[in-house]
Amino acid sequence: MEKLKILNLNFSFQRAAHYHINGGMLLMGVVLLAMFLANSPWGDIYASFWNYEVHLQIGEFNFFSHNGHHMTLMTFINDALMAVFFFSVGLEIKREILVGELSSFRQALLPIVAACGGMLVPVLIYYFMTAGTPAQSGLAIPMATDIAFSLGVLSLFGKRVPLSLKVFLTAFAVVDDIGGILVIALFYTSHLSVNYLIASAGILLILCGGNFFRVHNRWFYIFWGVIMWYLFLQSGIHATIAGVVAAFTVPATPHYKIGKYINRIRENIAVFPASDKESVVLSKMQINVLKSIESSSDRVISPLQSLEDSLHGMVNYIILPLFAFANAGVSLTADHGGLEVGMATWAVLAGLLAGKFAGIYFFTWLVIKMGFAGLLKGMTWVNLTGICLLGGIGFTVSLFIANLSFGDSPVLLTQAKMGVILGTVLAGVLAYLVLQFALPKQPAQE
């Protein structure tokens, strides 16, 4: 039974990793396209395109407006579509906490400590480089790791990569996501509307009630999650946080246990009419039995797993590429003709490249030397170096926090984005070079 559980977890991880890896490759292409357009003769058209307003209006009510402002395409992507991304992240975090690499203290300790170091050191480096300057407010930018990009780079080595390295990278990236979510919720709240917060709390009670009373219809959680998103948008708390909060209320237990499901399938097979095996047209009785099997199959998959599986494709192949296409198009030249770089650029670059590596590596070394954890199977101090460098690929959440930090300062925003893109590229290249040397030449034995 334990072996079956482990196999199921590995299958779940590998399926999720497949989406992340392919999505990471797509992101790379989209970033290059956005950079090309932003620095081409069509740069002004590219920049102005994202300022078109988005409306969903019924009478006088516009669903995509808040505080008297209408959403543009850019804010629709960053505030609405990215809420779906954070909903998916919330589902992944909940799964990891319940049955994954964060489900036990000893399992979780190494990636949690590594992630804490990977968040703390970049923030400190950024702070000391920008203290007392307008760029200081972006100190959370270099604390994130982009799981899709980093797994995309790791996938270039194919079966040479031990599964333990992929699991470790994914686990500490998930903890990074938790840190990023907390930062967004706590430090990027512009104002608070008590009435909308109270209404949001009411919706949260409905969602928690659905979980408590075992409501397994996933549309229940989607509907009330969308309402919560709108209330968060109006409340002043960043709307994407609604996605995470709603995700944590989605049930992780299926309606049917495996044993009951197997019995139901056997019962249906026993009554399935098979008199004419050559017929290409099913009888009404056969259709009814097959529908019963389909219904039972739906009920053995928990709402959490069902939603996570359904959203992976949309998030990795539509939402994140759109986000990258809208946000990564940075003009490389300033008005004076030079590169658009400044203190924010160098601080983000140092945080992602040096801070991430030093924080993850040192904190991992510390917790192992203190005897609280050990290196995972297939992990060495040399290939760990490459994984620590991959932690400096901060793309998606780093760009997202940059928008929140410098939304009112286009110059600082551009400088920070330059730092994110440079840091991501350099971290990816250095990680590739280190892992090319550190990983075994033959496929890893699991």
Swiss-Prot record:
How does this chain sit within the bilayer? Multi-pass membrane protein
The cellular component terms of Gene Ontology attached to this UniProt record, alphabetical and capped at eight, are: plasma membrane
GO BP field: regulation of pH
This protein's UniProt keywords: Antiport, Cell inner membrane, Cell membrane, Ion transport, Membrane, Sodium, Sodium transport, Transmembrane, Transmembrane helix, Transport
Q: Which InterPro entries does the record associate with it?
A: Na/H_antiporter_dom_sf, NhaA
Q: Which domain of life is it from?
A: Bacteria
Instruction: State one molecular function term (GO).
Output: sodium:proton antiporter activity
- Membrane-crossing segments per the record: 23-43, 73-93, 109-129, 138-158, 167-187, 193-213, 219-239, 314-334, 348-368, 381-401, 419-439
Question: Which reaction does this enzyme catalyse, per its entry?
Answer: Na(+)(in) + 2 H(+)(out) = Na(+)(out) + 2 H(+)(in)
Entry keyword annotation includes Nucleotide-binding: no
Name of one Pfam family that matches: Na_H_antiport_1
Name the predominant localization: membrane
Q: Does the keyword Transmembrane helix apply?
A: yes
**Compartments, as annotated in UniProt:** Cell inner membrane
As for what it does, the entry says: Na(+)/H(+) antiporter that extrudes sodium in exchange for external protons.
Per the record, the similarity remark reads:
Belongs to the NhaA Na(+)/H(+) (TC 2.A.33) antiporter family.
Which NCBIfam families does the annotation name?
NhaA
Q: PANTHER family of this UniProt entry?
A: NA(+)_H(+) ANTIPORTER NHAA, SODIUM ION/PROTON ANTIPORTER NHAA-RELATED
Q: What is this protein called?
A: Na(+)/H(+) antiporter NhaA
Species whose genome carries this gene: Phocaeicola vulgatus (strain ATCC 8482 / DSM 1447 / JCM 5826 / CCUG 4940 / NBRC 14291 / NCTC 11154) (Bacteroides vulgatus)
Organismal lineage: Bacteria, Pseudomonadati, Bacteroidota, Bacteroidia, Bacteroidales
